Design a protein with these regions (language model features):
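Bacterial N-terminal signal peptides that target proteins for export
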Residues: 1-8
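Active-site rim/loop-helix segments in enzyme catalytic domains that contact anionic ligands
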Residues: 91-94, 101-270, 274, 306-307, ...
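Proline-aspartate-enriched helix->loop->beta-strand connector
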Residues: 268-286
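Post-signal/leader-peptide non-cytosolic segments of secretory proteins
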Residues: 39-107
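PAPS-dependent sulfotransferase catalytic core
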Residues: 326-353
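Charged helix-capping and loop-helix junction motifs
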Residues: 296-304
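C-terminal region of N-terminal signal peptides and the immediate post-cleavage residues
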Residues: 16-37, 42
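Short, flexible loop segments at boundaries between secondary-structure elements
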Residues: 309-330
Length: 388
């Protein structure tokens, strides 16, 4: 010990102060002819860049009693970004999930990162025009993904109202939930909620309680009909008109919220970024060969997804398209248990849709055109579509 004391004494003699810990930089002071260096300790930077004003806004104005100032200041940057977004969009109830994410929270790209449970086995993201399109043209791909343990996240662009009002569309939504109960092989209780995305649009969500594998998103835009011109009940507006630039926006048939073409595209991209799916499936684009005679809403839905892939916002290698009405011209390629499961799910759905005159697998198989579509599924990768 005397040796170390002597060393420190010598250092002190030469005007060097010895301090423990990390420090930056030194300040020199001359006293009595001796120069003494004083180390200035710099406090660590805060974990996020929220200003005092932003913190106060979150904790006292937007979401009082939900999160404390101390907790907000302790959030790492991705959590702080998410908390600020949820607070600014009046979605305070989801902030608890942000706090629970801890320091390993990923960069914030969408509230869906916290609204939804993670899917370790991967995700299939599908985009359709109408409520039965996934059951007809997306099957058996969707049931197969669920059997493999993957999650399925499905976005429906229209309210599937066929000009018959919200009640008809809501009934079809009930049919979807019943059909997915069959696919999941369990009667489930479903919860309904909404989420406001980073593009400002609010989506309706339906998902089974206790089973995170399925989530259905409803944009509820006007059904365009087979003539592509829409219906009087929804102002004679449609997706084809929007894509063609004939109108600037559509309005959700339930809330009246305005939605532009960019709004639809950014919704697709946000869901894609939130879920990072292994596969994206949609209708075959109208600008590709093989869609002549398909429903105009189908064609436009495919075109919107195709544009996101062409622009690189969605990985083209992950995108596949399902042929719609024209698939009936191809040979039947589904049979046995695979076909039976598809028919059983569709029949349950159809029992909620008064336009489709069937409620059993056998009777649905005999419905004009529907039977032909149900016994087939034809898929085309994005990299193989043929454009005229």
């Amino acid at each position: 010990m005397r040796r170390y004391a002597a060393v420190f004494g010598i250092l002190a003699l030469f005007g060097v102060s010895v301090l423990s810990g990390c420090s930056t930089p030194s300040e020199a002071e001359t006293t009595g002819g001796r120069t003494i260096s004083t180390v200035v300790l710099t406090p660590p930077p805060p974990p996020n860049d929220l200003t005092d004003e932003q913190v106060a806004q979150i904790t006292t104005v937007q979401c009082p009693d939900v999160i404390t100032e101390e907790t907000v200041r302790a959030l790492v940057q991705p959590q702080a970004d998410a908390a600020e977004f949820f607070a600014s969009t009046a979605q305070c109830g989801d902030i608890a999930a942000v706090v629970a994410a801890g320091e390993g929270a990923p960069a914030f790209v969408s509230p869906l990162q916290y609204v939804e449970a993670p899917c370790p086995a991967g995700t299939l993201f599908t985009i359709w025009a109408h409520y039965d399109d996934d059951l007809i043209f997306g099957s058996p791909t969707i049931p197969d993904a669920l059997d493999a343990g993957q999650c399925v996240r499905t976005l429906y662009l229209t309210g599937s109202d066929a000009g018959m009002g919200l009640g008809y569309g809501y009934g079809r939504e009930d049919g979807l939930r019943a059909a997915y109960d069959v696919i999941l092989n369990a009667p489930l209780e479903w919860e309904q909620r909404t989420v406001t995305l980073t593009n400002g649009l609010t989506l309706a969500i339906s998902r089974p309680i206790g089973d995170p594998r399925v989530t259905l998103f409803f944009l509820r835009l006007p059904d365009g009909g087979l003539g592509a011109g829409g219906f009087p009940a929804t102002g004679m507006t449609s997706l084809p008109q929007l894509l063609a630039g004939k109108i600037r926006e559509l309005h959700m048939i339930d809330t009246g919220e305005a939605v532009s073409l960019d709004g639809i595209s950014s919704t697709v991209v946000e869901l894609y970024n939130a879920y990072q799916p292994q596969t994206v499936m949609a209708h075959l684009p109208g600008s590709a060969q093989g869609t002549s005679g398909d429903h105009p809403d189908h064609q436009v839905t495919g075109d919107i997804v195709m544009r996101t892939a062409d622009s690189g916002q969605v990985d083209p290698a992950k995108v596949i398209y399902a042929q719609g009405y024209p698939s009936e011209a191809h040979p039947q390629n589904l049979e046995g248990d695979v076909l039976q499961r598809k028919l059983d799910a569709f029949a349950v759905y159809a029992s909620h849709d008064p336009v489709i005159p069937c409620s059993t697998a056998d009777t649905c198989l005999n419905v004009n055109r529907f039977g032909g579509w149900l016994v087939r599924q034809y898929l085309v990768p994005h990299t193989e579509i043929v454009r005229p």
